[in-house]
Regions:
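Short acidic DE-rich linear segments
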Residues: 1-2, 61-64
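Short alpha-helix capping/helix-loop boundary micro-motifs
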Residues: 17-23
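Short, basic/aromatic beta-hairpin or loop at an interaction surface
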Residues: 1-17
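Short, solvent-exposed secondary-structure boundary/capping segments
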Residues: 50-60
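Short beta-strand-centered aromatic/proline hotspots
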Residues: 39-48
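Short, well-ordered loop/turn sites that connect or cap secondary structure elements
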Residues: 27-28
Length: 64
């Protein structure tokens, strides 16, 4: 399992906000479209924190 920390773009605040930490089996890459919590997101950035052994995912909701 890979640990991911999800940050979702908040248009009102104009910044990424922490959402939650999840475990997922597959590797997720920048530019990929994912489904999470019944919503569609585009992965706009991926940052691997080697110290914490987690991957930060920065997501923007796909309104299409």
């Amino acid at each position: 399992m890979i640990k991911y920390v999800l940050y979702i773009w908040n248009a009102d605040l104009k910044k990424f906000c922490y959402s939650e930490q999840v475990d997922y089996q597959a590797k997720i890459i920048k530019g990929e479209n994912i489904r999470w919590n019944m919503r569609k997101f585009k992965v706009v950035n991926v940052d691997h924190d080697l110290d914490a052994n987690v991957i930060d995912l920065y997501l923007e909701e796909d309104s299409a």
